[in-house]
Design a protein with these regions (language model features):
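Conserved helicase motor "Helicase C" RecA-like lobe of SF1/SF2 P-loop NTPases
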Residues: 2-44
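SF2 helicase/translocase ATPase core recognition
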Residues: 18, 24, 37, 41-42, ...
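Generic hydrophobic, helix-prone segments enriched in Leu/Val/Ile
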Residues: 22, 116, 156-160
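Intrinsically disordered, low-complexity segments enriched in small/polar residues
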Residues: 29, 62, 155-157
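Glycine-rich phosphate-binding loop signature in dinucleotide/nucleotide-binding domains
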Residues: 47-49
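Long, largely alpha-helical accessory region at the distal end of helicase-like NTP-driven motors
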Residues: 130-160
Length: 160
């Protein structure tokens, strides 16, 4: 399991709590971890006998990590940009992976996190409608219709 948070300071509090509850070590990866230490943590996590839980800051989670041993992702707090969360989740789910990955997102009702979740869903819907649009108006217009569509209506623009 990989737990993502945007706050390294929060992970420093969460990891000892999880370690106490689960009875196993919970390493922390964040932007301040040196490259050699980061590589050692990832290698240890990737081993079958390695720790079953890894706490990762969102920003550290978006820079070339391969955490496919996990099959659960927990986003503890939300980030405004859904692509950042997606990129973090993609550290666990990679092309060619045979096991499923379940992504859990924690949101407390009535908080700013709930509002952020709404903004994120609206952004996803907007991006989806732009990318997967089935609108065919432009592709089915005649040349005359297209020319009229893109031409400037001087009278309408100036009110004259």
């Amino acid at each position: 399991m990989v737990v993502f948070s945007q706050y390294a300071t929060f992970l420093r509090r969460l990891a000892p709590h999880l370690a106490g509850e689960l009875g196993l070590p919970v390493p922390i990866l964040h932007g301040g971890v040196s490259r050699p230490r980061r590589d050692a943590i990832v290698e240890q996590f990737s081993e079958e006998r390695g720790p079953g839980v890894l706490a990762v800051s969102l920003r550290a989670g978006g820079t070339g990590l391969n955490l496919v041993r996990a099959n659960h992702v927990i986003h503890f707090d939300r980030w405004w940009n859904p692509a950042v969360e997606d990129q973090a989740s993609d550290r666990v789910w990679r092309i060619g992976q045979t096991r499923g990955v379940v992504v859990h997102t924690l949101v407390c009702p009535g908080t700013i996190e709930e509002r952020i979740a709404t903004v994120i869903e609206n952004k996803r819907a907007l991006a989806g409608s732009v990318v997967t649009s089935t609108e065919t108006l432009i592709t089915t217009m005649s040349n005359d219709d297209l020319a009229a569509f893109v031409s400037l209506d001087v009278a309408g623009a100036t009110g004259k």
